[in-house]
């Protein structure tokens, strides 16, 4: 049977067909849909973990126990999971272990453009790299076999375009492999220094065998065409090159990106007149090719920054035929990202504007949009968890300079569970004056409303224990009187809490609790706001909320009732009572 699938759907299907039994992940674009689709296969136990490190440890434990296991994350998630990744390379596995890393060239939804191919090189584990959905399915199945044959985790690298593009896939049936017998082996699985020292040379021997495999792997293939131009490439870059050049070039398509196939590269390079290496972001393949003493054209012609596309490739390989593939003459209005109408974060950021002398350290989530006009409410955004820990650093630096500058650390509920708890402990332990604002919108909203430990539901929909953020704050040492919960739709309550937090001289926590506006609050389903033109002075104060439902049109203020979610924050901002509630 055939089906049209995204790369993420095909990865999930491949895991199912391979007999995978356990899967764990933390949501992050462009990888999120992998686990969501895996969860549709009831034969596989699937879970959202609190962060990528935990997810890989869960999957790693399952693999050592004898089950085939999969772990998925976006590229920056592998930074979080690097600790177990490197050690699992030493221990090896029992059942197959595949770690999917979804890189994001072009930074569609990320804070950096790191190239995770270097993780395979650094951790010394094999890496596969598909170029379309069919290969996503086939390569995942192969990855599990490779993992078990070589007793090693396999890194599976995809990129945004592979994850989200659709292509035709041939489906197969599930292979039931069961759970292998687990045998206790402390010298293999307990990495104290003495045992780890013994495992390192074993890993090096595996690498020698993997290098031989790469030279003979069907995943690395030569496609002969015109030998005047030779192209070494991998992943989505192969699709771009093939689209532009067709049979007017020859290709060495790399499907096993580590170890790279040295013999195959030498043979291919000798057979072509001019050699190009086409890859997104870092010159990973190019550096290896040049280390073999082979001359090639790579990043001196292709950009390091951003995605590649057929137009960019054509400008280099065939400039005389260059066409503006993606250019359009139509001028469309810009649509910058904004917090949704009725977003519960808006009230907090609006209220924070009062404290112009304060520093606000932000974090990763929908609330990252608080950086942008008209809210302009955030000073830094580094990585998950840094909303609190970077705030501690600011506060300590200001103290060293004898500056009494207030610092607010802002993060969401899922981010708090991910990596904010340890940061809050650090704030308490080191007696920081930081005030923390946790925006609890009852979901992991930015990646598509996944469950988290605060929702009381698991990925499969089972009822679980609700982890109370206020109780965590109290448990790690924040004083009871320094923990407040507010409804961010209530501006007066929110402003009073922020005033206390601003004046606090010890760790202070505000939990702003209100469900994401897109979760369709039943109580406000019929509530809308409208502008009373007779009362409105056109002061445009309401526009400072940055709500996409509010606009100044044809010389007057207007609220788009089809977009309004009835949060009523604009009503509270208007000093003239010109915004009124409609419905019930």
What are these regions (language model features)?
Residues 1-8, 18, 130-339, 344-347, ...:
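Flexible, low-complexity linker and terminal segments
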Residues 1-133, 161, 224-225, 248, 371-511, 521-522, ...:
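Thiamine diphosphate
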Residues 34-37, 60, 81-85, 107-114, ...:
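Short acidic, glycine/serine/threonine-rich loops at helix termini
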Residues 37-43, 242-252, 471-479:
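Short helix-loop-beta junction
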Residues 43-50, 91-102, 179, 184-187, ...:
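A glycine-rich helix N-cap at a beta->alpha junction
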Residues 104-153, 159, 186, 194, ...:
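Conserved thiamine diphosphate
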């Amino acid at each position: 049977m055939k089906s049209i699938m995204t790369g993420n759907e095909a990865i999930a299907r491949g895991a199912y067909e391979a007999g995978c039994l356990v899967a764990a992940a933390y949501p992050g674009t462009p990888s999120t849909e992998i686990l969501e689709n895996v969860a549709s296969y009831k034969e596989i136990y699937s879970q959202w973990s609190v962060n990528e490190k935990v997810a890989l440890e869960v999957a790693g434990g399952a693999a050592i126990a004898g089950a085939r296991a999969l772990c998925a994350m976006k590229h920056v998630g592998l930074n979080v999971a690097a600790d177990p990744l490197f050690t699992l390379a030493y221990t090896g596995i029992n059942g197959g272990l595949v770690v999917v890393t979804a890189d994001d060239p072009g930074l569609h939804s990320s804070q950096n453009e790191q190239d995770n191919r270097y993780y395979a090189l650094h951790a010394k584990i094999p890496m596969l790299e598909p170029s379309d959905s069919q290969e996503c399915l086939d390569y995942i199945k192969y990855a599990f076999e490779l993992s078990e044959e070589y007793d090693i985790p396999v890194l599976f690298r995809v990129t945004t375009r592979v994850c989200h593009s659709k292509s035709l896939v041939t489906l197969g049936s599930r292979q039931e492999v069961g759970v292998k017998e687990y045998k206790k082996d402390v010298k293999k699985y307990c990495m104290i220094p003495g045992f780890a020292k013994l495992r390192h040379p074993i890993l090096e021997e595996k690498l020698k065998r993997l290098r031989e495999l790469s030279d003979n792997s069907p995943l690395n293939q030569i496609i002969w065409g015109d030998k005047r131009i030779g192209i070494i490439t991998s992943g989505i870059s192969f699709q771009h090159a093939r689209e532009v050049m067709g049979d007017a070039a020859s290709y060495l398509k790399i499907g096993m990106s580590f170890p790279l196939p040295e013999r195959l590269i030498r043979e291919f390079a000798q057979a072509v007149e001019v050699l190009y290496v086409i890859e997104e972001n870092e010159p990973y393949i190019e550096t290896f090719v040049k280390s073999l003493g082979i001359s090639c054209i790579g990043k001196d012609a292709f950009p390091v920054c951003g995605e590649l596309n057929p137009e960019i490739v054509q400008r280099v390989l065939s400039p005389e035929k260059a066409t503006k593939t993606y250019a359009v003459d139509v001028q469309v209005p810009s649509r910058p990202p904004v917090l949704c109408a009725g977003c519960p974060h808006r009230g907090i950021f609006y209220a924070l504007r009062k404290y112009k002398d304060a520093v606000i350290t932000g974090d990763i989530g929908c609330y990252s949009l608080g950086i942008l006009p008209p809210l302009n409410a955030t000073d830094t955004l580094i990585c998950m968890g840094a909303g609190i820990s970077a705030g501690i650093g600011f506060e300590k630096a200001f103290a060293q300079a004898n500056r009494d500058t207030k610092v607010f650390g802002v993060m969401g509920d899922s981010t708090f569970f991910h990596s904010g708890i340890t940061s809050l402990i650090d704030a308490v332990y080191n007696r920081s004056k930081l005030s923390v604002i946790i925006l609890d919108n009852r979901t992991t909203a930015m990646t598509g409303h996944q469950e988290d430990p605060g929702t009381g539901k698991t990925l499969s929909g089972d009822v679980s224990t609700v982890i109370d953020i206020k109780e965590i704050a109290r448990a790690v040492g924040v004083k009871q009187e320094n923990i407040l919960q507010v409804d961010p739709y209530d501006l007066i309550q929110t402003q009073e809490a922020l005033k206390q937090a601003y004046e606090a001289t010890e760790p202070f926590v505000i939990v702003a609790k209100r469900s994401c506006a897109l979760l369709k609050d039943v109580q406000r389903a019929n509530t809308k706001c409208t502008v009373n033109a007779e009362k409105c002075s056109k002061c445009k104060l309401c526009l400072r909320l940055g709500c996409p439902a509010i606009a100044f049109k044809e010389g007057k203020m207007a609220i788009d009732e089809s977009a309004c979610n009835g949060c009523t924050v604009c009503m509270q901002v208007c000093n003239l009572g010109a915004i009124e509630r409609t419905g019930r």
